[in-house]
Amino acid sequence: MFEVNPVLNKLKELSERTELLRGYLDYDAKKERLEEVSAELEQPEVWNEPERAQALGKERSALESVVATIDVLTQGAEDVEMLVSLAVEGEDEETFHEAETEADALEKKLVDLEFRRMFSGQHDASDCYMDIQSGSGGTEAQDWADMVLRMYLRWGEAHGYKPELIECSDGDVAGIKSATIKFTGEYAFGWLRTETGVHRLVRKSPFDSGGRRHTSFCSAFVYPEIDEDVEIEINPADLRIDVYRASGAGGQHVNRTESAVRITHIPTNTVTQCQNDRSQHKNKDQAMKQLKAKLYELEMMKQNAEKQALEETKSDIGWGSQIRSYVLDDSRIKDLRTGVETRNTQSVLDGDLDKFIEASLKSGL
């Protein structure tokens, strides 16, 4: 005979946690708003304003993910309880194992939804950009920056965030000097915001004929894409705009014609670049959008006394602002903020970052 009580206890706990989430996440208000948004999207005239229609579509998707998940959890718990009853009545072990599997799947959905409660920041639901910059150290540091770029591209692809290489500047011999990735999808900024900081690599360098250990640094800076209606005053006189030929390491992702655009905001020395379109005009628009988003995020960071000052975040590519250490010849990667550690270095470099990101979010970084 099979053990029924553990499954029934799990279902009871799942139902209680679902009810708590129903309150925390304002289920009733979201369901009502979902009906309003869906009704508006059914009106033909809404498509006369493509930007508004797009914003409503995005809002509907976010609302559906909460409302539908809570509905699935509520109905699912009842369905599994019925499966357990049928299994007991018919002494059917196969049906009972099906109930156990369903209960485990429901628990995973619930844990995912509970985790998303941590995405309560103003821009957590937004798309985002990540700037990657190699530190001092020449070819070794530039190769490390390229490895970090690949790691985040892999992470983004695995999570359905459609990573797009906006800009990429080749290293002198190998690797890259800098790159910008755009991540598009729900809660992209929420997931990646704690990845801002310095990544430290220790390894026997393939570029050193003596095979000596080298330490290299690379910084990542994450900032959300902001809505067009957010007012960011940028004086055109404060901008320097340069046009150049794209020369990135992005292969087919990066355009090679002389239409790449670099914009420098002189008062803050903030730089954005775009080279992924054949149109100089489109690249300039994209670079301006990035600049606006970057200046906004930097202003938010300045206003938040709990965060590091902009100068520390941007200029100290060294020991002080490290977030993670990658010691490859010792097969050890450790997050210096949360203490999370793994010896599966290749998996992490292939984009398996969730254990680190989840721990940093849970610790409130």
From Swiss-Prot:
Superkingdom in the source lineage: Bacteria
GO cellular component terms listed in the entry, alphabetical order: cytoplasm
Keyword check for Hydrolase: no
MF annotations from Gene Ontology: translation release factor activity, codon specific
UniProt xrefs under InterPro entries: PCRF, Pep_chain_release_fac_I, Pep_chain_release_fac_I_sf, PrfB
Sorted UniProt keywords: Cytoplasm, Methylation, Protein biosynthesis
Record's comment on post-translational modification: Methylated by PrmC. Methylation increases the termination efficiency of RF2.
Sites bearing N5-methylglutamine, chain numbering: 252
Localization terms from the record: Cytoplasm
Signal peptide: none
HAMAP family in UniProt: Rel_fac_2
Family, similarity comment: Belongs to the prokaryotic/mitochondrial release factor family.
Free-text function comment from the UniProt entry: Peptide chain release factor 2 directs the termination of translation in response to the peptide chain termination codons UGA and UAA.
Protein name as it appears in the record: Peptide chain release factor 2
Organism: Tolumonas auensis (strain DSM 9187 / NBRC 110442 / TA 4)
Lineage, uppermost ranks: Bacteria, Pseudomonadati, Pseudomonadota, Gammaproteobacteria, Aeromonadales
Gene: prfB
